[in-house]
């Protein structure tokens, strides 16, 4: 399997875009801007509060307005940890990933996930 075969494709395409954005803790400005632009470009109500939380609201699909609201929450930063012998600048470098068997792995083993 290669990265282009990961499903659902739209999720992994978005994941690849996010991996291009350096976002160590306390320095999430680029990620905040990316998410803000993402919401606004889709015509969604988008705001950033005074502490840097990005809130994107999507109206219910027609016919589902009576159902409970769904909230998705996540942190924007990443844990900046790597092997000692790996050169990686968490303030500047994009995360490069590849598929290793059943694992999506970052070069330098700075992260991995079962696929």
PLM segments and residue spans:
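A non-catalytic alpha/beta surface segment that caps or lines the substrate-entry region
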Residues: 24-68
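Short glycine-centered, acidic/aromatic-flanked micro-motifs in structured strand/loop junctions
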Residues: 21-23, 58, 74, 108
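Active-site metal-coordination/substrate-binding segment of hydrolases
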Residues: 64-112
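N-terminal capping segment at the start of a domain
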Residues: 2-26
């Amino acid at each position: 399997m290669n990265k282009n075969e990961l499903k659902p494709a739209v999720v992994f395409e978005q994941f690849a875009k996010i991996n291009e954005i350096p976002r160590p803790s306390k320095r999430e400005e680029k990620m905040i801007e990316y998410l803000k632009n993402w919401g606004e470009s889709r015509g969604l109500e988008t705001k950033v509060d005074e502490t840097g939380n990005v809130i994107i609201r999507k109206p219910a699909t027609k016919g589902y307005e009576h159902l409970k609201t769904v909230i998705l929450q996540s942190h924007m930063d990443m844990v900046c940890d790597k092997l000692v012998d790996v050169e990686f600048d968490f303030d500047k470098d994009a995360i490069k990933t590849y598929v290793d068997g059943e694992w999506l792995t970052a070069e330098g083993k700075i992260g991995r996930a079962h696929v």
